[in-house]
């Protein structure tokens, strides 16, 4: 595929510079930019907060407290502590929140927010409404996202594609649905080579290596369920990064995607992660519940990237599946809405070895546990081209790698148990 149809919907949602600066203090923000945007977007945001039934929440920034609450005339923010739930941030974390460099979830699991689990839950629940006020991205309402085919009729969500065939239809489908399945992209020999390198990396991993997440089965088998920086351990994968077939995936859409890091830290170079999901896993993050790859932050600076899954085993009920919420990349969706159920269709992808799954970084997706056979997949991706003045602004790669590795730390998950703990049959 060489360049998408220019008439296809763009997935470039960037509205903020990577090096965006924020307020000098919490007082300056709440009395200035917040008040200004509340005057513009306040009615919609108040309705969003009401639908989500958000509790009062105090945000303390370096000792200066302000409280968010639903008042009689919309969302109110009051100086001082006026809530039973309080989260604490330093000024740098608060600036990252306002700029969306990090979301509330990203700050909580990154150990940059202090609060008990209930306060952290409330903090994360308020986050979509903060975006509704600050950026005008209203929280999703039923019917907001129609799924329309290229012919104007309902979009057929069961479509499968091959590179070089039906290019316009593939581009339309990916932009509309937020995912696509590409059949028979890589050969058995290539997959065998990656599988062998993956096995070596699994055997070499250790709990404290800073490059792996660990899980355990009900039989007590502890294993590395996710190998970070797998591209460093797989020469075959590094060769594929320059292969025309791989590069063609980034050309499906007209937005200029190029190999990069779609996972949340936004490194300047291409990265990969090797995942294995063993039967009977009961501890750890072998599988993740519904989430977006931008859930931890950066949506308005980086989205939408493309997350690429190279299937080393089939994706099916036996090996474990991949579900995607069609159209979810086009909406600001609160976690509570996902838990209650959306009117958007959840599509269970079924793939063979050598197929490639693609989903946008803003698309809600989840993996499901294997029933009888281990699942193995390598995830890598594409990012949008940098804009003038853009640069990696999240700190050194070493620090970012440390932050990513810490997600697998079970003590971090305890900060927000309901958000991150695997759930039977759907994590």
Predicted feature residues:
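Non-heme Fe(II)-dependent double-stranded beta-helix
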Residues: 152-176, 183-288, 410-412
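Histidine-centered metal-chelating micro-motifs
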Residues: 94-95, 295-296, 362-366
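Non-heme Fe(II)/2-oxoglutarate
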Residues: 332, 358, 363-427
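Hydrophobic beta-strand signal
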Residues: 114-115, 181, 358, 379
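Catalytic core of non-heme Fe(II) oxygenases with the double-stranded beta-helix
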Residues: 248-251, 255-258, 280-350, 389-395
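Feature captures hydrophobic
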Residues: 2-165
């Amino acid at each position: 595929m060489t360049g998408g149809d220019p008439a296809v919907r763009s997935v470039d949602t960037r509205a903020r510079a990577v090096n965006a600066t924020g307020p000098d203090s919490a007082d300056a923000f709440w009395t200035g930019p917040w008040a200004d945007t509340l005057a513009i977007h306040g009615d919609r945001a108040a309705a969003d907060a009401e639908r989500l039934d958000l509790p009062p929440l105090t945000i303390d920034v370096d000792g200066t407290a302000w409280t968010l609450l639903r008042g009689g005339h919309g969302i109110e923010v009051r100086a001082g502590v006026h809530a039973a739930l309080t989260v604490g941030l330093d000024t740098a974390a608060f600036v990252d929140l306002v700029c969306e460099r990090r979301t509330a979830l990203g700050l909580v699991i990154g150990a940059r927010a202090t609060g008990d689990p209930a306060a952290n839950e409330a903090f994360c629940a308020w986050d979509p409404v903060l975006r509704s006020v600050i950026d005008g991205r209203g929280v999703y309402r039923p019917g907001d996202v129609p799924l329309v085919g290229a012919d104007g009729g309902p979009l057929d969500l069961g479509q499968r594609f091959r590179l070089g065939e039906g290019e316009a239809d593939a581009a339309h489908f990916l932009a509309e649905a937020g995912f696509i399945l590409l059949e028979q992209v890589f050969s058995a020999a290539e997959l065998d080579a990656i599988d062998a390198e993956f096995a070596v990396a699994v055997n070499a991993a250790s709990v404290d290596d800073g490059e792996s997440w660990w899980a355990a089965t009900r039989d007590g088998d502890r294993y590395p369920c996710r190998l970070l920086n797998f591209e460093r351990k797989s020469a075959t994968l590094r060769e594929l990064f320059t292969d025309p077939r791989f590069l063609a995936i980034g050309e499906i859409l007209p937005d200029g995607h190029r190999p990069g890091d779609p996972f949340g830290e936004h490194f300047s170079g291409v990265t990969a992660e090797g995942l294995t999901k063993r039967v009977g896993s009961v501890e750890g993050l072998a599988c993740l519940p519904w989430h977006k790859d931008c859930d931890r932050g950066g949506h308005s600076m980086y989205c939408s990237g493309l997350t690429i899954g190279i299937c080393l085993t089939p994706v099916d009920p036996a090996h474990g599946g991949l579900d995607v919420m069609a159209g979810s990349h086009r909406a600001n969706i609160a976690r509570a809405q996902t838990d209650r159920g959306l009117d958007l269709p959840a599509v269970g992808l079924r793939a063979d070895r050598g197929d490639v799954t693609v989903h946008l970084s803003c698309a809600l997706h989840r993996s499901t546990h294997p029933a009888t056979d281990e699942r193995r997949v390598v995830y890598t991706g594409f990012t949008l081209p940098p804009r003038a003045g853009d640069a990696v602004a999240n700190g050194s790669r070493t620090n970012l790698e440390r932050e990513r590795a810490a997600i697998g730390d079970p003590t971090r998950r305890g900060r927000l148990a309901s958000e991150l703990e695997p759930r039977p049959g759907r994590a």
